[in-house]
Amino acid sequence: MMNHPARPAAQLAQLTSLAQPALPAQLARSGGRAILADALQESRARTLALLNVYVASLGEELIVPDSPQLNPPRWEVGHVAWFQDYWIARNRQRERGIAAEPAHDRPSGRLAQADSWFNSSLVPHQNRWDLPLPDFAAPRDYLAASLAETLALLAVTPETDDDLYFYRLALFHEDMHTEAAVYMAQALNIPLPAALLAPARALPENRALQLPAQDWQLGYSGNGFAFDNELGAHPVAVAAGEIDSCVLSWARYLPFLDATGTAPPRYLRRSNDGNGNETGNETGNDVTDGAGWQCLVGGHWQPLNIAAPAIHLSWFEADAWCRWAGRRLPTEAEWEAAALTLPDFQWGEVWEWTASRFHPYPDFSAHPYRDYSAPWFGERYVLRGASRATSPRMAHPRYRNYFTPERNDIHGGFRSCAR
């Protein structure tokens, strides 16, 4: 990555176009100190707002079940504070950007055992429930102290991409954890205030978009921040074909359940007619109302909005619908090309499963946070887009999300392509 100067907001505002990501994502990746300072404080405010919701529901002990899809909330809070502290205040090579040596000697942290408690590279997921973590006040104070020092250092940091790299990384890292906290709240039946999610929007009518044949340059190139798995832009032959203009709605998904007898997805159930008899759609056509279905939101069952995106679907459920409908999932190259070239391609409601396994691009080189991508290549599938729980800063059309195919706790959905 070259050491280019960061761009001021006025210049970035001119970049919004069909071929550019939404402005918040571009600002976060290429903006200067003032933009980053505001973003870091906004992200921390969301972290604290979510923490307050958890405390109100669970108490200050913040005890949750041991599960592969959850993390102990006290560990999460400490980890977010530790990550920012470790990669910024304690990082003697932060001005080197991606050339920094990750294992260099660092000064001691503000919590004596922080490295042994909160370093996710050293603490396996299953061990996090057994750590002798400090009481609730210590991680909260850790959050405040780490942010204060980060902002003080940022104020005197040169405005180049190398110098700002770790500030941007810490920002995106915290945004990822606040999104994970939204997923975990749903899994724990914790209701969230509406302000912590983007407003729900009914999907427009789906249309068949024609994606022309092309050699698509897959991946990120240019100035500003990029995740290591986005780099290595390379041409990929994309065949001409048809792709949905928007993600699948429940109205399109539910007939598959009735036609095949497939069990409903997570957080979805059939309602009944008042006499204990389940109701449903037996016609195989698009569902026109949600009278036969309910969804679980924040611990409460409510009528399903069938115009809303189908959500909390695993890769297997998305693929099964496609096979039933004679369709297929797009590859990540098809998705990226459509998002950046087709004006009517709508995205941002749910993370979208693709047919592509998460593999490195050519000449992949891990960035200093070594465990961000490399350990997960091959076993996961790529999701593209963003969801209502995603910070707008993360909603970049070249961003590669990735999960194991059974995950149905995330805000995952899909769109389809013609075979």
Regions found by a protein language model. Give the residues of each.
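Bulky hydrophobic/aromatic "packing anchor" residues in well-ordered structure
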Residues: W216-L218, I243, A310, A318, ...
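Short acidic N-proximal helix/loop "leader" segments that mark the beginning
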Residues: A213-A233, T260-G261, S271-G274, A291-L296
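Surface-exposed recognition segments
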Residues: L231-H234, T260-R266, Q346-R419
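Extended, Lys/Arg-enriched charged tracts that mediate electrostatic binding to polyanionic substrates
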Residues: A202-L218
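N-terminal regions that are enriched for targeting/export leaders
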Residues: M2-L15, P21-L62, D66
